[in-house]
Amino acid sequence: MEVLAEPRWPPGLAVMKTIDDLLRCGICFEYFNIAVIIPQCSHNYCSLCIRKFLSYKTQCPTCCVAVTEPDLRNNRLLDELVKSMNFARTHLLQFALESPPISPVSSTSKKVVVKVHNADAAQHPVKQANRLMDKFLIRETGDCVFELLGKENERKFSPQKELSTSAEIKETSLLGKPVLGLSDANGPVTPSTSTMKLDTKVSCPVCGVSIPENHINKHLDSCLSREEKKESLRSSAHKRKPLPKTVYNLLSDRDLKKKLKQYGLSVQGNKQQLIKRHQEFVHMYNAQCDALHPKSAAEIVQEIESMEKTRMRLEASKLNENVMVFTKNQTEKEIEEVHSEYRKKHQNAFQLLVDQAKKGYKKTGRVSQAAAMRTDEPAETLPSMRTDEPAETLPSMRTDEPAETLPLMRADEPAETLPSECIAQEDNVSFSDTVSVTNHFPQPQLDSPGPSEPERPDDSSSCTDILFSSDSDSCNRNDQNREVSPQQTRRTRASECVEIEPRNKRNKN
């Protein structure tokens, strides 16, 4: 919402800026609206501002003293001061604008007064010089200076006197001896008996407070009016009670809508919007409870509805700024112009998105290159198998091969028929993933599936129930490092099976 800027204080009234700042709220920086005071720290704020702040933090915004809403108290004096300040502000600004600039005559007249005073001081005594200067001031400035000097004398004699009584004393004292009274102002001040008599105090018959005699009439009027106000307040209705706080987490949507309907608020929107609407109503209602003449609930509801409409209008205007709008009657040329204007308007945003995409592409490219380099490493870089690993880590034989391809040695053949090529070579044994298949079986047998091997009885020799010696173990490791033909594979398998003996025969031997 657009708010008209307040006019600044002119240089001649710069002193008023301090008073202006003291009459403003420390939260909204506007003039106090239903001012309330925090008794713990004596800081003042608008009632609505401090209640909204306390809904988030229960402390003073200035000094962080712990405060709750029931601790707040009205400060009617600040409200009256704000009203007087707004009234005086317009008149002071108008007076400052309409008053003519200061003429140089006043400065020359002051110089003349100083010169005359110095000349008289050299020729005559001090009292006579003061009298001449007073006469000169009265002749130059007229009645205005005469009245101002009279007021100063009266303030020195009796500072508690009112303007009405001081005006009467001024006329009687100054009309008799105008020059002598003015000359006495510059000399030593000696209180007279007439002024001492005016300081006598009299007790008020209503409240019993001792009041100066010249103020007793005004005090009596205020006392009597105060008693009438008290009686009228007692007879009038009691102060409006504020609404209690609501725990929204425990309320269902149905109960929340029921509360809104109770005060005449709208029930449209989701739960968060309903909660926000109810909170605003409670804050404004409780703030008006502190006012001398609070607004009704219907007026507060109207204000909330107008605020929501203004907020929605602003949000819609912001959305329309970032959206291209077309109509059916627009030509292709007009549509292209809208597109070009949109591109020019959001060129910086487009460039920012392009830069972000390029940075992300560079990062992903580096990651993909590093992954490709890892996959292209040769197989020789893999760690070699340790020679002391057990035989179970060797690749196992496929069970789907035909039994005819596995030549078995007779059990009664001696073990000395082992081939000479099965010599242990335990240094630098290495293997690859494909060795486990090509070293033991020919390619035709791998391509053509065969019948599964039939089950054998327990008393016959099986490949699972074998005992490996150190010679056969070294032979197996040696075979993995060489490419062999199918015939050599059969011979190697035959030599390996020499060690295989049935358990019954092994026990007999």
Curated annotation (Swiss-Prot):
Pathway it works in: Protein modification; protein ubiquitination
Instruction: Spell out the subunit comment.
Output: Homodimer. Interacts with UBE2A and UBE2B, one homodimer binding one molecule of UBE2B. Interacts with HLTF. Interacts with SHPRH. Interacts with SPRTN; leading to enhance chromatin association of RAD18 and RAD18-mediated PCNA ubiquitination and translesion DNA synthesis. Interacts (via C-terminus and phosphorylated form) with SLF1 (via BRCT domains); this interaction is required for efficient repair of UV-induced DNA damage. Interacts with SLF2. Interacts with SMC5; this interaction is increased in a SLF1 or SLF2-dependent manner.
What does the UniProt function comment say about this protein? E3 ubiquitin-protein ligase involved in postreplication repair of UV-damaged DNA. Postreplication repair functions in gap-filling of a daughter strand on replication of damaged DNA. Associates to the E2 ubiquitin conjugating enzyme UBE2B to form the UBE2B-RAD18 ubiquitin ligase complex involved in mono-ubiquitination of DNA-associated PCNA on 'Lys-164'. Has ssDNA binding activity.
The listed locations are:
Nucleus; Cytoplasm, Cytoskeleton, Microtubule organizing center, Centrosome
Q: Where are the zinc fingers (RING-type)?
A: 25-64
ZnF UBZ4-type residues are 201-228
**Cysteine disulfide partners in this protein:** none
Q: Which InterPro entries match?
A: Rad18, Rad18_UBZ4, SAP_dom, SAP_dom_sf, Znf_RING, Znf_RING/FYVE/PHD, Znf_RING_CS
Q: Where is the SAP domain?
A: 248-282
Q: What is the E.C. number?
A: 2.3.2.27
> Hey, what tissues is this thing expressed in?
Expressed in thymus, spleen, brain, and ovary.
Organism lineage reads as: Eukaryota, Metazoa, Chordata, Craniata, Vertebrata
Q: Where is the composition biased (Polar residues)?
A: 435-446, 463-473
Return the protein name: E3 ubiquitin-protein ligase RAD18
Q: Which UniProt keywords apply?
A: Acetylation, Cytoplasm, Cytoskeleton, DNA damage, DNA repair, DNA-binding, Metal-binding, Nucleus, Phosphoprotein, Transferase, Ubl conjugation pathway, Zinc, Zinc-finger
Q: Which residues carry this modification: N-acetylmethionine?
A: 1
The Swiss-Prot or TrEMBL record annotates one GO molecular function as: polyubiquitin modification-dependent protein binding
| The keyword Membrane appears for this protein | no
LR motif: where is this motif? 232-240
Its GO biological process annotations read: DNA damage response; negative regulation of DNA recombination; positive regulation of chromosome segregation; postreplication repair; protein autoubiquitination; protein monoubiquitination; response to UV; spermatogenesis
* Chain residue ranges for the region called Disordered: 365-401, 435-509
One GO cellular-component annotation of the UniProt record comes to:
chromatin
